[in-house]
């Protein structure tokens, strides 16, 4: 039944997947079955632009084992978990963690899977919740050993360590550790998530942006091969950003953006449709393919329609941030500085959604 639900999810039959999972969550008895159903629900609600519902499911899952978390933890909550990382690390070098034994306890492995799946919707929902989840993933790895989810966790703590904890140097080392685990220990299940997170959010701040772009391309390929729906979509969005930053041909960037939009539509992934729609609009207007240079409106995209969608659905706040950023860029290059400033102010109020 879980396999059928996953197939329904991958083929964008989201209503059927939701109904099946709601039935299965009532029937699941073992820790493993509960974790599998929960993980699929988290993927489903992320795809459905229901990060709030995903967080509710996650917190309910935690409560089953007697753990109570707030959906809006404080910075102090996060700092306690972050400091626990360094207590557990002790005198070891970050690079030495690549040699930790692999986790064999099925309970811990299932727990890591659920925590890994909640990271994305948690980031959309509350920045402190996302930080707390990532820190817990790392502490679980330090306590029990490495697994597929550890690769992703180490890269995400790299993303948080600098902006949120003012520890950029060690953050980058953790990011490299995550990638090394994929490549040297064969922990490839979350390869796409690890590569896109490092390539788009860690590497560009330490190396030339093109090195990150190439890693994001590998993430796209890996996501398709392993059927990682969520990060196949996110990787495509990030690839367009990286290609723009690398100065690639706008014709090539447009192809990448249109491929991402088509993927979002095929999978009914509303968040990605909004991300990619704005990317396509920006590239088209930069190429002079829209009726008015600097305006993303054409026969296939409407800025007004996008803004109405965002006004109706606060779960699309991350996509709205990207929209206003793309609109800012479009207006700036057209010399419409008043409209660019207006777009920048709208983007600024949503800056918290952009990640660490």
Q: Model segments located where?
A:
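TPR/TPR-like alpha-solenoid signature
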Residues: 2, 39, 116, 135, ...
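Eukaryotic all-alpha helical interaction scaffolds
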Residues: 8, 25-28, 45, 65, ...
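Alpha-solenoid helical repeat scaffolds
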Residues: 22, 52, 56-59, 135-138, ...
